[in-house]
């Protein structure tokens, strides 16, 4: 893990923060300073790529990494800012000619499902999209919704994230 300390999700921050914030919401005591440091690390990770996001480019892991990062920030109570707005713009530009979001590689169990990629991107748009992006967000959500309704899941991950995504778009 020490060798990967600059990497975001699977090496250090995303899923552990989800576990910490879930534990806190259920009454467990957690180290709040540590949680804030991890949230700041995540925000800084995204911030280093802000200009790339505005141009429709991202970082390694593309939609999955950016989507999990925004999900992480939301779980920690992070408020929308210039960086999260840039990531929302990225979701509007990236794969815009596709009817859904696709992972950039096949690395199960964390990066394989088109349903997961679509969910994390839609979630990021819904939580961190700006009012001036609303029309484009609504159009993209409808585009992905149509894909979700007609596409059959192949495995458990697909089923789970298809259901989660359908909740977002209905």
Sequence positions of predicted segments:
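Preference for long, amphipathic alpha-helical scaffolds in soluble/luminal domains
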Residues: 1-170
């Amino acid at each position: 893990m020490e060798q990967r300390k600059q990497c975001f999700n699977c090496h250090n921050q995303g899923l552990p923060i989800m576990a910490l914030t879930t534990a806190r919401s259920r009454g467990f005591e957690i180290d709040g300073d540590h949680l804030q440091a991890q949230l700041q690390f995540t925000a800084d990770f995204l911030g280093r790529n802000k200009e790339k996001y505005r141009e429709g480019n991202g970082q390694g892991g593309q939609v999955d990494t950016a989507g999990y990062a925004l999900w992480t920030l939301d779980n920690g109570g992070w408020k929308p800012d210039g960086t999260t707005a840039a990531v929302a713009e990225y979701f509007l530009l990236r794969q815009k000619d596709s009817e859904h979001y696709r992972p950039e590689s096949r690395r199960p169990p964390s990066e394989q499902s088109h349903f997961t990629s679509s969910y994390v991107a839609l979630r990021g748009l819904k939580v961190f999209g700006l009012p001036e992006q609303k029309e484009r967000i609504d159009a993209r959500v409808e585009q992905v919704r149509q894909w979700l309704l007609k596409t059959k899941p192949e495995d458990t991950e697909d089923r789970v994230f298809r259901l989660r995504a359908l909740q977002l778009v209905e």
